[in-house]
Amino acid sequence: MSVMPDHWIKDKAIQEKMIDPFIDYKESSGILSYGLSSYGYDARIDNKFKIFTNINPVTVDPKNFPLGSFIDKEEDICIIPPNSFVLAKTVEYFKIPKDILVMCVGKSTYARCGIVVNVTPLEPGWEGYVTLEFSNTTPLPAKIYAFEGACQFIFLKGDSQCSLSYNEMKGKYMKQLDVTLPIVNNS
């Protein structure tokens, strides 16, 4: 696998709408940076958040996630409670080519404050807004900022195309438009 450079990311974003909207430079003046970097793309988060709370003490179960465990907020700054997490989605919509796997890593600025971002790989053929999870690992409240850089996506090109893409597998998170909670298919 090869890590794809800025010019490849830019070409795919412009020609195939791989990232939309796409910022072809690094915006960093007084904010958490976002946009095109040497070997990746720093994405932003929207201002709609699902804040995990323990007001209804239940067992967290990915097969039967307790919906009442979230508070929905729409604001430019989100406060993550101590030792808790928040779900958000990217501003950018992604369309991943069939020969590309995308990995996500956190921003060093957030990491240095005890805020960790987590997302699973964007698989070949997947498209949608990316649901991100921000964990506050500290015993104090922590802030994250809407419409600023939240994470970096790194594009890995496979030696050949996969036999079956996420779209062709009819993946359960295909074309998600909002923050999406866990889905377990019962087939």
From Swiss-Prot:
Catalytic activity: dCTP + H2O + H(+) = dUTP + NH4(+)
Catalytic activity, EC: 3.5.4.13
Catalytic machinery residues: E133 (proton donor/acceptor)
Top-level division of the source organism's lineage: Bacteria
Residues noted as binding dCTP in the record, renumbered to the chain: K107, S108, T109, Y110, A111, R112, T131, L132, E133, Q152, Y166, K175, Q176
Disulfide partners: none
Keywords: Hydrolase, Nucleotide metabolism, Nucleotide-binding
Function, as annotated: Catalyzes the deamination of dCTP to dUTP.
Functional pathway: Pyrimidine metabolism; dUMP biosynthesis; dUMP from dCTP (dUTP route): step 1/2
First-tier enzyme category under EC: hydrolase
Subunit structure as annotated in this protein's UniProt entry: Homotrimer.
Name of encoding gene: dcd
InterPro entries tied to this protein: dCTP_deaminase (IPR011962), dUTPase-like_sf (IPR036157), dUTPase_trimeric (IPR033704)
UniProt xrefs under Pfam families: DCD (PF22769)
Entry similarity comment: Belongs to the dCTP deaminase family.
Alphabetical list of NCBIfam families matching this protein: dCTP_deam
GO molecular function, one term: nucleotide binding
A biological process from GO: dUTP biosynthetic process
Protein name: dCTP deaminase
Keyword Hydrolase among record annotations: yes
